[in-house]
Amino acid sequence: MHKVFIAGSIKIKHLDAKVKARIDNIIAKECDVLVGDADGADTSIQQYLWEHAVTHAVVYCSGPMPRNNVGSWPVRSVDTSYAPGSRAFYTAKDLQMAKDADFGLMIWDSQSTGTLSNVIELLLLQRKSVVYVNKLKAFKNVRDAKELEELVALMSDTAVKKADAKIRLFEKIDRLKQLQGDLFHA
């Protein structure tokens, strides 16, 4: 059974009908859903899964207890030595979800470095993502560095600079290009 890592920007509190339809497809295929415990998109995803009586979901959290678990699903607690509440602390669960997933469905506001980081981690593990870009009301497939660059092009200059400062965005894109052999095709 496929495992789908579904996540999104913390600022996104409501799921678009197109995202719900995509989640409906995941539910119909009885894929295992891996979801985080954050407020925002994670909680909205959990709520939608609960409303559809999904039983094949796992809530991932950093540390011993999830912040949110709407459906009382099994919990995958990820141990981390980072300070509770820090960015690195919460990133630990995202990294584990990327490792455990076969592919990702991301809901993105064209700013969130956490969601963008999830897409990158999946790519580094040779897994693709389907990213719903909220401002476009459209899905973008991200299967390689080129498609990641197309996604990044949707960000404002300020958001790109912030992402580079927070997650070393350009360094990660270059790493992906090297891993995928894109540098030899430039």
Where are the language model's segments positioned?
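Leloir-type glycosyltransferase catalytic cores
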Residues: E147-A186
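Active-site donor-nucleotide binding/catalytic segment of nucleotide-sugar enzymes
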Residues: I6-K11
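Extreme N-terminal starter segment of soluble prokaryotic enzymes
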Residues: M1-V4
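Acidic/glycine-enriched connector segments
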Residues: I12-A153, D157
